[in-house]
Regions:
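Short, well-structured N-terminal submotif of metal-dependent ribonuclease cores
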Residues: 1-63, 75-88, 151
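Active-site neighborhoods of divalent-metal-dependent phosphate/nucleic-acid chemistry enzymes
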Residues: 9, 17, 95-143
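Short, acidic/turn-prone active-site loops that include or flank metal/cofactor-
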Residues: 42, 143-144, 160
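Active-site-proximal, substrate-binding regions of enzyme catalytic domains
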Residues: 69-101, 109
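Short acidic-hydrophobic, aromatic-tinged amphipathic segments that line or gate anion-handling sites
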Residues: 100-102, 154-160
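Short loop/helix-cap segments at secondary-structure boundaries that form the rim of catalytic
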Residues: 145-150
Length: 160
């Protein structure tokens, strides 16, 4: 099975953007656990918002937008956000300068990582993306942080 021309084109554009972004500046792969806090109306946003101020290029699998929106939907169901808040959060997320990579292009290496680590495929998509671009991973998920350390993916820290 081959990658669709559309998927190939998006991936090529991301690679071109990454290549021209700057020597020595590692891109940062952002997962849903980080993006969630940016627009969730949380009182404890912590240092996660500092990620938006970085000079590094932000990269994410397209899966991240759906995962993040699902987390906001859970807050909606609990009465912690209203539908307008969720819609605004989605709009703000999609307006960010994030290079979106088709998740389908990461499934083979992610499946290998999932098998090797005994870790969910969803998280391994982020790991596969970080490994394929020598990127740093930004996540608030402790299990994913441990998996990243096991495969040699560097972790982002607000402390620099």
């Amino acid at each position: 099975m081959t990658t669709s021309p559309v998927g190939r084109g998006r991936t090529a554009r991301v690679r071109e953007r990454l290549a021209g972004y700057g020597v020595g500046v590692a891109p940062i792969v952002v997962d849903a656990s980080m993006a969630f806090f940016w627009f969730a109306n949380e009182s404890d946003v912590r240092q996660d918002a500092r990620l938006l101020e970085t000079q590094s290029m932000l990269v994410a699998p397209d899966l991240m937008a759906a995962e993040t929106t699902n987390a906001w939907w859970k807050k909606l169901r609990r009465g912690e956000m209203d539908v307008t808040d969720v819609e605004e959060a989605v709009t703000n997320l999609l307006a960010l300068e994030i290079a979106w990579v088709p998740s389908s292009t990461l499934l083979r290496p992610a499946a290998r990582l999932a098998a090797d680590l005994g870790h969910p495929i969803y998280d391994c998509i982020y790991l596969a993306l970080a490994l394929s671009h020598s990127a740093v991973l930004a996540t608030a998920d402790e299990r994913l942080r441990r998996a990243a350390e096991r495969v040699g993916v560097r972790l982002w820290s607000a402390r620099g």
